[in-house]
């Protein structure tokens, strides 16, 4: 099967956890779109190693289908981890380029969530705070400072709290 191995390990864990409890979805491609799973994924403790996906707090994950050379989104309320451990030190070994790229992913989440038609006052608050934190901390995270990593860990988490309530735009479907 094709799993999102080029992405966050949390995304991979979410897909595997859902399939373990819902074996009828053994072909991961059957999870595309709004997945009609019946059982919650296996108990999961998410420990993000990047500051970008917010997989630890959202009902979304992206699968890369390497055979068809495309990615697709899965939306499933049964895949949210029970516990999230946000430890900026887990991101310390990321190369500068990956840190910048995942930071831009978090920024894209915040902008798309803020501009979506479903946005409202509470989600605007999350997204605007995420944008502010990213503007303040992305450069430091790329330079691997503790303050920068901590700020980006919080920023991507806050962006995830926002977009998990309103969805994203077309950028994330490309």
Give a label for each model feature.
Residues 1-8:
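Short, small-residue-biased leader/transition segments that mark boundaries at the very start
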Residues 6, 45-48, 85-87, 108:
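Short beta-strand segments
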Residues 7, 15-16, 156:
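Glycine-rich, small/polar surface segments that engage phosphate groups of diverse ligands
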Residues 10-12, 37, 41, 51-57, ...:
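Short, well-ordered, mixed-charge alpha-helical segments that flank or form enzyme active sites
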Residues 15-32, 59-69:
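A glycine- and small-aliphatic-rich helix-loop capping segment at beta-alpha/alpha-beta transitions
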Residues 22-49, 78:
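Short, acidic/small-residue loops that bind anionic groups at enzyme active sites
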Residues 60-166:
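Carboxylate- and glycine-rich phosphate/diphosphate-binding segment that chelates Mg2+/Mn2+
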Residues 166-174:
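C-terminal catalytic subdomain
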């Amino acid at each position: 099967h094709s799993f999102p191995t080029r992405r966050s390990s949390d995304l991979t864990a979410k897909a595997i956890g859902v399939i373990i409890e819902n074996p009828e979805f053994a072909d991961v491609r059957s999870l595309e779109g709004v997945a009609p799973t019946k059982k919650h994924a296996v108990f999961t403790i998410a420990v993000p190693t990047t500051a970008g996906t917010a997989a630890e707090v959202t009902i979304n994950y992206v699968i890369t289908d390497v055979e068809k050379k495309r990615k697709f989104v899965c939306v499933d309320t049964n895949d949210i981890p029970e516990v999230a451990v946000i430890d900026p030190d887990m991101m310390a070994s990321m190369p500068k380029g990956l840190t910048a790229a995942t930071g831009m992913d978090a920024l894209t989440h915040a902008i798309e969530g803020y501009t979506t038609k479903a946005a409202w006052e509470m989600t605007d608050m999350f997204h605007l705070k995420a944008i502010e934190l990213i503007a303040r901390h992305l450069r430091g995270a790329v330079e691997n400072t503790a303050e920068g990593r901590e700020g980006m860990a919080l920023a991507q988490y806050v962006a995830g709290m926002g977009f998990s309530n309103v969805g994203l735009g077309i950028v994330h479907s490309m």
